[in-house]
From Swiss-Prot, chain A:
Name the UniProt record assigns to this protein: Bifunctional protein PyrR
Top EC class of this enzyme: transferase
Domain of life assignment: Bacteria
Transmembrane domains' residue ranges: none
Gene Ontology molecular-function annotations: RNA binding; uracil phosphoribosyltransferase activity
Subunit structure as annotated in this protein's UniProt entry: Homodimer and homohexamer; in equilibrium.
Keyword Transcription among UniProt keywords: yes
Pfam families: Pribosyltran (PF00156)
Protein task: Regulates transcriptional attenuation of the pyrimidine nucleotide (pyr) operon by binding in a uridine-dependent manner to specific sites on pyr mRNA. This disrupts an antiterminator hairpin in the RNA and favors formation of a downstream transcription terminator, leading to a reduced expression of downstream genes.
Curated annotation (Swiss-Prot), chain B:
NCBIfam families cross-referenced by the UniProt entry: asp_carb_tr (TIGR00670), PRK00856.1 (NF002032)
GO molecular function: amino acid binding; aspartate carbamoyltransferase activity
UniProt source species: Pelotomaculum thermopropionicum (strain DSM 13744 / JCM 10971 / SI)
Swiss-Prot/TrEMBL catalytic activity: carbamoyl phosphate + L-aspartate = N-carbamoyl-L-aspartate + phosphate + H(+)
GO aspect biological process, one term: 'de novo' UMP biosynthetic process
Positions with a binding annotation for L-aspartate: K86, R169, R223
Keyword match Transferase: yes
UniProt xrefs under InterPro entries: Asp/Orn_carbamoyltranf_P-bd, Asp/Orn_carbamoylTrfase, Asp/Orn_carbamoylTrfase_sf, Asp_carbamoyltransf, Asp_carbamoyltransf_Asp/Orn-bd
EC number(s) reported in the record: 2.1.3.2
Oligomeric form and interacting partners: Heterododecamer (2C3:3R2) of six catalytic PyrB chains organized as two trimers (C3), and six regulatory PyrI chains organized as three dimers (R2).
Residues involved in carbamoyl phosphate binding: R58, T59, R108, H136, Q139, G264, P265
Family annotation (SUPFAM superfamilies): Aspartate/ornithine carbamoyltransferase
The protein's name: Aspartate carbamoyltransferase catalytic subunit
Family that this chain belongs to: Belongs to the aspartate/ornithine carbamoyltransferase superfamily. ATCase family.
Length: 181, 309
C-alpha cells in the first residue's frame, strides 16, 4: 500500500498555478487567436476546462476544449498489468492550422505525451503543439519537455504523484505517495 | 488474457457486463472510423488470421478492416473451397496458425462447435465468425450496438426476429444477446423453420408475423438461406413473401420509429420489400459500418494487452 509522504499543493496552490499558466499561454501566443486546448484523459480534461475558464476571465474569449483518450496509442499495452478500457476522443473542431495546447496533470516518462502527440497528428495538422502540465516530476524516458509547468517536483521512482481534483476525486490537492518496497 | 477472456465463441454464456464493455468499447472505435485517417497504432506487430471455410465477403472484409484500422497485420486462409473432413482440416488449420504465430484467429466454419474446438487447440484468441447453425456472436453484438445507438437503451425493448430461425446462427446469438440485456424477443416464421426449444432460450414464439410485429421497437429480418432450402421447408418464394415478408403495410404494426435490420445479404422482394430495405426506418447500412467498430472493439479487448501467452 502507498503511504502519503507529503502534500505538494493545496486548493489555493492549484488555483494559483492554473491562473499563472493561463497568463503564460496568452502571453506566449500573443492572445488567444487560433488557440485550442486539448485535455488528456482523465485529469487533463478538467484542468483544460479550468484553463479555458481562466483564459476567458482574462481575455474575454472562449477557447475550444477537446478531450483526448490515448489508450489506443499507448506503446506499452503488453507490459501493463491491466488492459485499459478505451474511452472516447472528443475533439469536435479541426486542429489543422491551430495552436494546440495539450493539458495533462503530471508529466513523468513522457510516453503519455508521445502517444498524445501521435493521436493529435492523426486528427489533423496543427500549426504548433504546446504542453501544459500541473506537475513535472522528472524521470523522462523520451526527449519531451513541457512548455508550461505548475510545479516542478523532484521525486524518486518509488514515489507516486497523485493529483486529486474536485471533478473526479471530490477533493483538491496534490500529494506524493510512497509505495512500500 | 484479454479483458473479455481468451476467446469469443458465443453469447450464450456471456454476462451482461461483458457485453456492455464490448458495446462501450465500440463507441470510441466508431469515432476512429469517422476520421479522415482511419488508423491507430494499437495492435502494431500483432497478426490476425481469418480462416473462412464458408464464403462470406461481408464478415471477412469487416474483420480485416477492423484489424487494419488497429494496425494489425492480416492473413487470409481461404478454405472455402476445401471439403476435407472437419477433424482433420481443423487440426491442420490449427497447426498452420500456430506456425504463423497468430495473435487472433477469426474462424467461419460450417460445423457447429468448430470455433470452440479450435479455441481449445491454439494459444491465439479465437473469434467465432459463424459456426454452422450455432452462433454468430459478432453479428449479434453489432445488432445490439446498432439498436442501443438508435434507441439509447436495450432494456425493455421489444425485438421481433422474423424468418428462418432454424438455420440462423444470427438469430440464436441475437436471442441470447437481446434477452441477456433485458429486451423481450419475439420470433415468427414458417412453422417448419421454428425449431423446438426456443422458449427455453427466453424468447416468445408467435403464431403469426403480425403478432410478433405488434408494437415492436426493433424488427430483425432474417435472410431466407436459399442455399439451405433444398428440403422444401416452405412452399415457394412468392408465398413466403406474401405470408412472412416484411413490407410497408406489415411494418405499420410495429411501434412508430421501429428500427429495421437485416444481417445481409438481402433477398429483396422475398423476406424484405425494397421500400422497407431502403426506407427511413432501415438501419441496414449502419449495421455494416457498426460491424467494423464492434469488431475493432473485439480485437482490442481480446488481443490488446495483458500477457496472454
Amino acid at each position: 500500500m502507498a503511504r502519503e509522504k507529503a502534500q505538494i499543493l493545496d486548493k489555493d496552490g492549484i488555483r494559483r498555478s492554473l491562473t499563472r499558466i493561463a497568463h503564460e499561454i496568452i502571453e506566449r501566443n500573443k492572445g488567444t487567436g487560433n488557440l485550442v486546448l486539448v485535455g488528456i484523459r482523465r485529469r487533463g480534461v478538467p484542468l483544460a476546462e479550468r484553463l479555458a475558464g481562466r483564459i476567458k476571465d482574462i481575455e474575454g474569449r472562449t477557447v475550444p476544449v477537446g478531450i483526448l483518450d490515448i489508450t489506443l496509442y499507448r506503446d506499452d499495452l503488453t507490459t501493463l498489468a491491466h488492459q485499459p478500457v478505451v474511452r472516447s476522443t472528443e475533439v469536435p473542431f479541426s486542429v489543422s492550422g491551430k495552436i494546440v495546447v495539450l493539458v495533462d496533470d503530471v508529466i513523468y516518462t513522457g510516453r503519455t505525451v508521445r502517444a498524445a502527440l501521435d493521436a493529435i497528428m492523426d486528427l489533423g495538422r496543427p500549426k504548433l503543439i504546446q504542453l501544459a502540465v500541473l506537475i513535472d516530476r522528472g524521470h523522462r524516458e523520451l526527449p519531451i519537455r513541457a512548455d508550461y509547468v505548475g510545479k516542478n517536483v523532484p521525486t524518486s521512482s518509488r514515489e507516486e504523484v497523485s493529483v486529486r481534483l474536485q471533478e473526479i476525486d471530490g477533493e483538491e490537492r496534490v500529494v506524493i505517495l510512497e509505495t512500500a518496497e | 488474457m484479454g479483458l473479455i477472456g481468451k476467446d469469443l465463441i458465443g453469447l450464450r454464456d456471456m454476462p451482461a457486463e461483458r457485453i456492455k464493455l464490448i458495446l462501450d468499447t465500440a463507441v470510441p472505435m466508431k469515432e476512429i472510423i469517422r476520421r479522415q485517417i482511419k488508423k491507430v497504432p494499437t495492435l502494431r506487430g500483432r497478426t490476425v488470421v481469418t480462416v473462412f471455410y464458408e464464403a462470406s465477403t461481408r464478415t471477412r472484409t469487416s474483420f480485416e478492416l477492423a484489424a487494419k484500422y488497429l494496425s494489425a497485420d492480416t492473413v487470409t486462409i481461404a478454405a472455402a473451397a476445401s471439403s476435407v473432413s472437419k477433424g482433420e482440416s481443423l487440426k491442420d488449420t490449427a497447426r498452420t496458425i500456430a506456425a504463423m504465430g497468430a495473435d487472433a484467429v477469426v474462424l467461419r466454419h460450417p460445423m457447429a462447435g468448430a470455433a470452440e474446438l479450435l479455441a481449445r487447440t491454439v494459444d491465439a484468441a479465437v473469434i467465432n465468425a459463424g459456426d454452422g447453425a450455432h452462433e454468430h456472436p459478432s453479428q449479434a453484438l453489432l445488432d445490439l450496438f446498432t439498436v442501443r445507438e438508435k434507441k439509447g437503451r436495450l432494456e425493455g425493448l421489444k425485438v421481433a426476429i422474423i424468418g428462418d430461425i432454424m438455420h440462423s446462427r444470427v438469430a440464436r446469438s441475437d436471442i441470447w444477446g437481446f434477452t441477456r440485456m433485458g429486451a423481450e424477443v419475439r420470433l415468427a416464421g414458417p412453422a417448419t423453420l421454428l425449431p423446438p426449444g426456443l422458449e427455453k432460450m427466453g424468447a416468445r414464439v408467435c403464431s403469426s408475423v403480425e403478432e410478433a410485429l405488434m408494437d415492436a421497437d426493433v424488427v430483425i429480418v432474417l435472410r431466407i438461406q436459399l442455399e439451405r432450402q433444398q428440403q422444401g421447408l416452405f412452399p415457394g418464394l412468392r408465398e413466403y413473401a406474401r405470408l412472412f415478408g416484411i413490407n410497408r403495410e406489415r411494418l405499420r404494426l410495429a411501434a412508430p420509429g421501429a428500427v429495421v435490420m437485416h444481417p445481409g445479404p438481402m433477398n429483396r422482394g422475398i423476406e424484405i420489400s425494397p421500400e422497407v430495405a431502403d426506407g427511413l426506418q432501415s438501419a441496414i447500412n449502419e449495421q455494416v459500418n457498426n460491424g467494423v467498430a464492434v469488431r475493432m472493439a473485439l480485437l482490442y479487448l481480446l488481443t490488446g494487452g495483458g500477457c496472454r501467452k
